[in-house]
Amino acid sequence: MVVKDNLRTPIVCVMGHVDHGKTSLLDMIRGSAVVSGEAGAITQHIGATEVPISAIVEKCGNPGLLDKFMVPGLLFIDTPGHHAFTTLRSRGGALADLAVVIVDINEGFKPQTIESLNILQQHKTPFVVVANKIDKIHGWNPQKGAPFMTSYNKQSEHVRGSLDTKFYEVVGELYNHGFSSDRYDRVNDFQHNIGVIPISAITGEGIPDLLMVLLGLAQRFLESNLHYNAEGPGVGTVLEVKEERGLGTTLDLILYDGVLKKGDTIVVGCLGEPIQTKVRAVLKPRALSEINVEDKFKQVSKVTAAVGVKISAPHLDGALSGGSVRVATAETLDAVVEEVRNEIEDVQIDTDQSGITIKADTIGSLEALVNELKKEDIPIRKANVGDISNRDIMEAFAIEDPFHSVIVGFNVNILPDAKEKVRSTGVKVFMNDVIYRLIDDYRDWVKEQRAISEKAVSETIVKPAMFTIMPDCVFRQSKPAVVGVRVIGGTIKTKVDVATGDGTVVGIVKGLQSRGENVSVATIGMEVAMSIEGPTVGRQINEGDILHANIPERHVKILEQELYDSLSADELEALDSFLDIKRRDNPFWAK
């Protein structure tokens, strides 16, 4: 076996939509070689599962492969989903070296599938796609744990045809999102094409192929990134901050470089000044054979990258998920503190003067949320990690723009004392664990609120209208004048002033009748009887005249600045015609 001593295990994250099989896949990988005492057995870490090269080769049934690979195995992050991917960040990008995007072959792409692809593309992370649940294809004959082609060749022609159709629908969806892909065994260049592996996370079919493709990708594209310093100071990323009985606040972290020992001084990233503390205990999970032992962790004196581990230390309150953990010596302490401080500052989001407030559970997910909001041109006034607090509510409440008096929370809760404030202030709070859904919910709400406010404004505003007095349709000359009119633009209502072609206001619309019935409005094309209080036909108004609804100057400004997009083409024509009249003598009228 040609494993290089200074190559660490590549870190793999499994991403995809809810219920598409992320957890089942991790369970299958975990369970595939968890046999007590077996050589090359899978090792359970804190928050991760290590599959050594020997177990992968054995699963593939080809011992000759052992000499072809230099990486020691694969380290799968146990928390599935893009949440884990964004949490596990290293300086300048994602910590995961490789990703597996899982998609249900029978359901195709869903919002989280697309979100996962976007995040991977953003971080330039190599990935494969697994088309899961092939065992659910009608008529499928399962071959437990078999490589995909072995299983595929044992299916009937009809079932193979059904799989091929569904498979190429997945390939088509990848193409629609800008990725060229094909079945993994037909891909020659993984740098430019995505390998798609049909699998069943329940029967284990295709799992050997997946592990082999991941090893190949690691070997091909990552070897230069996997070198680590076996004696150097440990560097890791916090996966989770947890309270453990008897231990207090602990950190679950992935150590991706160097060594971490009990008694080491560490610097931990937080929103304020970095935490400086000493490692009290380094903990690993007990083997499955020791599961009855009351204490589920065992203490070790040191660990070497790449490894998932729990540490206990004083003063860890305030440590950030996704934050950095670095080992420091007396000589390097100041420099390490500065480095960790800079990492957190790198993530401080560029905010706008006015905008919404966003909260997320980790630095990485905050970055992901900010990126998506920026793409949608949604301004952000404040972005922070943590649950929604009383202060967040009060700050959002103080914002004048109702569309910005909003808090968007990704994977967070509202603190108990803040819940009452949400009710009393009316601040709008959106919460979800899918970024797409959060953005859609916010946009839909804005659209709905705009429509409501436009309707309210619109109902109090005099709208543009243009109408002509039809020939031979004078029913009464005055007190009030009653004439037949045709609406040639916009909407005319009762109680609106009437202006002539030179802008003179001559009266007010008292009533409208259509086919003998009283109506309150008349729209373009309608011919109605109109009673106008004020003018006399033959003096101020005449047959054939084109008249306008007289729009007050303040209303014109609202129409032009706030409601312009909601006006129809004929309303715009009527408005332009009215403005031409009013601005003949005063070009700055209503400007």
Swiss-Prot record:
Q: Where is this region: G4?
A: 132-135
What's the source species for this entry? Methanococcoides burtonii (strain DSM 6242 / NBRC 107633 / OCM 468 / ACE-M)
Region annotation (G2) ranges: 41-45
- Give positions of region: G3: 78-81
Asked whether the UniProt record includes Protein biosynthesis among its keywords, one would answer yes
Q: Which GO terms describe its cellular component?
A: cytoplasm
Q: Where does GTP bind?
A: 16-23, 78-82, 132-135
Molecular function terms from GO: GTP binding; GTPase activity; translation initiation factor activity
Location of region: G5: 200-202
Which protein are we looking at? Probable translation initiation factor IF-2
InterPro entries, alphabetically? EFTU-type, P-loop_NTPase, Small_GTP-bd, T_Tr_GTP-bd_dom, TF_aIF-2_arc, TIF_IF2, TIF_IF2_dom3, TIF_IF2_dom3_sf
Q: List the disulfide bonds.
A: none
Which PANTHER family does the protein's record reference?
EUKARYOTIC TRANSLATION INITIATION FACTOR 5B, TRANSLATION INITIATION FACTOR IF-2-RELATED
- UniProt family annotation: Belongs to the TRAFAC class translation factor GTPase superfamily. Classic translation factor GTPase family. IF-2 subfamily.
tr-type G domain residues are 7-223
Positions of region (G1): 16-23
Q: What does this protein do?
A: Function in general translation initiation by promoting the binding of the formylmethionine-tRNA to ribosomes. Seems to function along with eIF-2.
Q: Which UniProt keywords apply?
A: GTP-binding, Initiation factor, Nucleotide-binding, Protein biosynthesis
